[in-house]
């Protein structure tokens, strides 16, 4: 092993410096650079040289998929777990990450061996939770340990079919002198666990904590090393949890799986669209929008509230929608449709805790604002989507036919869409519009 060297590493972003700095030049945070001792190289040397084969021969060794025991999660991952796949799952403390992984471990352990490595809880604590969840499986091995070298030795000995590491911030390597959870330790642990999983074809779930800003704690390289990144979201005092696929080398991103927290653990919600629009109120400011980020559209409720401004400067607040995009939409409404909100507070919310980034939501947000402003309901059997341009034009968006088919499946009979899409769906009335003023005239 090479001689250790000293570096000052930012604990927020992983930036390295040869000397201490008060402010990190990369992320701008203060007093985050900590002195760490690390080996000269983190390069991973293969025990055997890799094969050089034609791409067609590699395809013959195509990835076999293993189920997680949850159909909706399998679908979100692209069909299940791939051998050697390393999945990082991140979320707030207490949100239910360990509960979900314990349930997955139990379902995979039917006929296979699963190793659950816990750096946060004792074996007794995990056993108590397992009992509460009704888990009693001899193939589920629990190993409370924080030493990486001991964990790797146990993996070589037990040869599990699935590894769960809870969590990466609690594990340390003897190769480094820094404490567990430091940037260097997190990087080293992830590298070596990933190396083992790829070599032995063992899929793994690695739990990662998040920062107060909501991003994954640790260096960004952590997200690059793993194959898949899952974000586990939801309010701690709410029953529902959402797993979002942020990155996936073996499937599409943007997929979601919805779960309901019960006293017996997490239960999957097979129809996310039904969940997100189940409590929709027929009131001004409420619009249904068919959202698509992955392969399957999901119906979401977009809500807007327009009220007289309480202060000299009107407020613009959003939850789940880009505030800059809202500012653009309000400006277009004022110039092109004479809908003035300059002396009013405007609030926009995407119900259910979802975040929408695609411009296809523009028209839905605009119509929700107009609905609240005019205090007139949007007809309840309408779905709305389309991008709003600066001249008020309604621009085409992708997956228009899939969005409409999902809406029809849930009983929606009318749709306000961009005129340029030229889509017809049997059993649905399509209202194509080319300008935002046309859209307002159709609905109100």
Curated annotation (Swiss-Prot):
PROSITE patterns assigned to the protein according to its UniProt record, in alphabetical order: RECA_2
Residues annotated as binding ATP: 91-98
GO molecular-function terms, A-Z: ATP binding; ATP hydrolysis activity; ATP-dependent DNA damage sensor activity; damaged DNA binding; zinc ion binding
Annotated TM spans: none
Keywords per UniProt: ATP-binding, DNA damage, DNA repair, DNA-binding, Hydrolase, Metal-binding, Nucleotide-binding, Stress response, Zinc, Zinc-finger
Chain residue ranges for the region called Lon-protease-like: 345-444
EC number: 3.6.4.-
Annotated Gene3D superfamilies: 3.30.230.10, P-loop containing nucleotide triphosphate hydrolases
First-level EC class: hydrolase
Positions annotated as zinc finger (C4-type): 10-27
UniProt motif RadA KNRFG motif: location: 247-251
GO BP annotation list: recombinational repair
Function, as annotated: DNA-dependent ATPase involved in processing of recombination intermediates, plays a role in repairing DNA breaks. Stimulates the branch migration of RecA-mediated strand transfer reactions, allowing the 3' invading strand to extend heteroduplex DNA faster. Binds ssDNA in the presence of ADP but not other nucleotides, has ATPase activity that is stimulated by ssDNA and various branched DNA structures, but inhibited by SSB. Does not have RecA's homology-searching function.
Family: Belongs to the RecA family. RadA subfamily.
Domain notes per entry: Has a putative N-terminal zinc-finger, a middle region with homology to RecA with ATPase motifs including the RadA KNRFG motif, while the C-terminus is homologous to Lon protease.
Name used for this protein in its record: DNA repair protein RadA
């Amino acid at each position: 092993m090479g001689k250790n060297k000293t570096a000052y590493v930012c604990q927020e972003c992983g930036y390295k410096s040869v000397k201490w700095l008060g402010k990190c030049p990369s992320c701008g945070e203060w007093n985050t650079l900590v002195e760490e001792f690390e080996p000269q190289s983190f390069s991973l040397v293969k025990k055997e040289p890799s094969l050089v084969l034609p791409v067609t021969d590699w395809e013959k060794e195509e990835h076999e998929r293993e189920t997680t025991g949850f159909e909706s999660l399998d679908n979100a991952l692209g069909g299940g777990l791939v051998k050697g796949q390393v999945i990082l799952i991140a979320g707030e403390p207490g949100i239910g990450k360990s509960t979900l992984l314990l349930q997955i471990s139990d379902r995979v352990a039917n006929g296979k061996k699963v190793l659950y490595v816990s750096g946060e809880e004792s074996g007794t604590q995990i056993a108590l939770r397992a009992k509460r969840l009704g888990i009693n499986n001899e193939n589920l091995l629990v190993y409370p340990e924080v030493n990486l070298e001991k964990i790797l030795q146990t993996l070589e000995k037990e040869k599990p079919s699935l590894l769960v590491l809870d969590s990466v911030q609690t594990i340390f390597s003897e190769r480094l002198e820094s404490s567990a959870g430091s940037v260097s330790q997190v990087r080293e642990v992830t590298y070596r666990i990933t190396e083992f999983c790829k070599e032995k074809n063992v899929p793994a779930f690695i739990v990662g904590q998040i920062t107060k800003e909501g991003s994954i704690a640790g260096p960004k390289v952590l997200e690059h090393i793993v194959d898949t990144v899952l974000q586990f979201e939801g309010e701690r005092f709410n029953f529902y949890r959402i797993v979002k696929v942020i990155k996936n080398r073996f499937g599409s991103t943007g997929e979601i799986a919805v779960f309901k927290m019960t006293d017996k653990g997490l239960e999957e919600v097979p129809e996310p669209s039904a969940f997100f629009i189940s409590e929709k109120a027929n009131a001004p400011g409420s619009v249904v929008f068919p959202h698509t980020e992955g392969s399957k559209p999901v119906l979401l409720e977009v809500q807007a509230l327009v009220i007289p401004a309480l202060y000299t400067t009107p407020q613009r607040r959003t939850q789940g929608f880009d505030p800059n995009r809202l500012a653009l939409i309000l400006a277009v409404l004022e110039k092109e449709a004479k809908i003035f909100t300059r002396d009013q507070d405007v609030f926009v919310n995407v119900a259910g805790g979802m975040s929408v980034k695609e411009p296809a939501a523009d028209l839905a947000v605009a119509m929700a604002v107009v609905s609240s402003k005019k205090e007139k309901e949007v007809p309840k059997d309408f779905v709305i989507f389309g991008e709003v341009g600066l001249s008020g034009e309604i621009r085409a968006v992708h997956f228009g036919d899939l969005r409409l088919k999902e809406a029809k499946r849930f009983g929606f009979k009318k749709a306000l869409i961009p005129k340029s899409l030229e889509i017809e769906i049997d059993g649905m009335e399509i209202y194509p519009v080319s300008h935002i003023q046309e859209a307002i005239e159709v609905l109100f």
